[in-house]
Amino acid sequence: PSLDEPMTTWYPDWATHGKGAITLRDVLEMEPGLAWNEDYDPANGVSDIVQMVAAEPDQLAYAESRPKEVEPGTEFDYSSGTAMLLSGVLQQATGMRADQYAKEKIFDPIGMTKVDWWQDAAGHTLTYCCLDTTTRDFARFGLLYLHGGRWGDRQVVPADYVEDSLAGAPNSPDLYGLQWWLDDPEGVPADHFSAVGHDGQYIDVIPSLDLVVVRNSTYVKDPGPSVADPNLFLKYPSDDLIPGKGTIPPDDWDESKTLAPLVADLTD
């Protein structure tokens, strides 16, 4: 589908709930205008992200139900709920779960062989998080984008989509594109972009240096099935007691401390 396809193509009831103008591009750019609170600290009350993860067996239905707050395309607001909407889009557009589609079209073609992408209790792939793989396989994904979506002699991701991904959203041109962060840590070239995951997972890509840097924290998935514990936050209100979590990065840990020395060595 076109990036400017209305989301009512996949969520037709939005047409009668004031959300008919929201496009797929708005969702990818985190600018759909939907109400959402991304506060992860349960001490501050039950935010949308806590509610979705802790109490909603069908996380996609919860994300879909969020009301419009502002006009789409007018404000950047990072939201796990917005990213979760992509799970429904992919499943309806392809007839496959998002993880199955990604395995066939992206992961297998680039050699990502050890991948586990979580689902909610209703069987929807968690497209806002929770893709477990190896550091080398994350690096493969970074290399795919470093090479403009091409892997060997195969164009795995359309080149024009890769270009759009890194162009910058209208209300966050130097911060966010289509599901990629575009901000530049101090001492790092301006063409840097990154994927940033939970608890210190990073894929940093710097095309001008032909460089991909992957950093994994010690986060380890809880043993058991690929389903997020619906009582995660309720059972473990303290952030450092949530099972499956590893060391917590210090408050002042930023990408520049990892990337800047590497960049300096490469450019000396």
Locations of the language-model features?
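Solvent-exposed, acidic/flexible segments
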Residues: 4, 17-21, 52-56, 75-83, ...
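Solvent-exposed loop and edge beta-strand segments that line ligand/cofactor-binding
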Residues: 70-78, 126-132, 195-202
